[in-house]
Amino acid sequence: MHYVSVEGLTKSYGITPLFKGISFNINEGDRIALIARNGVGKSTLLRILSGKEQPEAGTCKIHKDVHLVMFEQEPQFIENATVTQNLFNQEHPTMKAISNYEMAMESEDEDLITNSIMEMEENNAWDFESKVKTILTQLNIHHLEQPVSKLSGGQRKRVSLAKTLIQIGFEPKHVLLLMDEPTNHLDLNMIEWLENYLEQEKVTLLLVSHDRYFLEAVTDEIWELEREKLYSYKGDYENYLEKKAARIESELASIDKAKNTFRKELEWMRKQPKARTTKSKSRQDNFYEVEAKAKQKIDDTNLQLEMKMTRLGGKIIEAKKVYKSYGDLVVLKGFDYTFSKGERIGIVGKNGVGKSTFLQILQGITQPDSGKINVGETIVFGHFSQEGLVYKKDMRVIEYLKTFAEQFPLASGGSLSAAQFLELFLFTPDKQYTYLSALSGGEKKRLQLLTILFKNPNFLILDEPTNDLDLPTLAVLEQFLLDYAGCVLLVSHDRYFMDKLVDHLFIFEGDGVIRDYPGNYTQFRILEKSKQSYASVSSDISTSKESATVVEKIVP
């Protein structure tokens, strides 16, 4: 069954074409990842499919029996309404019953609770209410009577995600789910739960995400928007990389062939008289096609860049018996650690356990309650925070980067200009003269990252650097960090990114306890799951023994 049929879709942003004449079908059961650089039309394509934007040309047909549900990066709410009212603003009796029940339980009014229970029973809503409870619990959504306007950015995203999941669980059989970066603002446990949830829900899915493990878990086909075209690849992310590399190799060979032909045809064109025969006119038309092919550029995001890092001395950072609390929240309880040269440490823990506070304490931004943080004299921190790009006045991208430095020194003794450095990180010459206010969220994140790297730090502290970055930018950043000789302290919900870059983990277990685990995130999760399985089996054996003992006592 075709859920969606698209023919000849074209859309531009101002004078910039996003995609031109693309066609595709989405069929029942498809699970598709849509990837591309920021600013080339991923979110726009989703909005066209949902009917929130119109194409300039082409058709988009949704099957009449298909119910479309969309999760957007910028959630829309009734701001003065409560979380409950926003979650359940549906007209169906079952949704109303659940909404009334949740509000009654929050109010603790016995009459309201009794009436809401009767309404739940009349509408057979208990099974669905149980599913709703699971969604809210797993996404850490509490205080349902709080106005949405009081929520933080991360809380808003989680409420929006919960609303989306409630909708797909409630809607009839044929559901098409469109999701735009659903893992942003989720911790690692939430992401793993969401993977399992989407696998269980038999929905047809079109997903935009930079989280490669998430893509591999919930999709089986990758579409890429590139140079105004849409390319499709069956299989997982690794297969996509292989197939794309083969395609680019073929395209480069084709361009080289066109360049050779172009040189010959250019010589012929110069020798031709102005009056053309029909045959020469045809050859002339073909010349312009060959010229366009020969001048085509294929982007290569492979980065080889050895920075001239600020020298690291023998002493890095020493933490001695560090304590920090905020009221009842204990962030650090006697933390001791001596950092070594070239260490790459990943930080793992639930939202709200104090990971960002820990990073601030190491840099001296926040003071501990007791204990000492001794930082080596040669340490130059480069801190990527979640606060985003900070600028006092609007200016062009290249002007902004030059306020930090004019040149980027290389280990070879040379240097890169600000323009060259920007281009390495996928800011084209045209984009370099764009005003900061006109950049997308992902482009601002990328520029924020560049300003930190441009300062030549020898100790990088990266707090969720992958949020809002596209996959091509992530590939460039990963390669840069793999070649980086300094220390790296990384907080990220991107497990692929973490696995590729870190040597060991600081596990924030809560109540101020930090455990040092010698391995990457995937290895840690495998160990944790094996412990849980062992504990479960041991519990079952213990229960069986107790039951057997009881039977022996009862049976004469």
Regions inferred by a protein language model and the residue ranges of each:
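ABC ATP-binding cassette signature C-motif
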Residues: 1-255, 305-556
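Intracellular alpha-helical coupling/juxtamembrane segments of multi-pass membrane proteins
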Residues: 243-276, 280-284, 290-297
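Proline-centered turn/helix-capping motifs that create local helix->coil transitions or kinks
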Residues: 277-279, 289-299, 393, 532-540
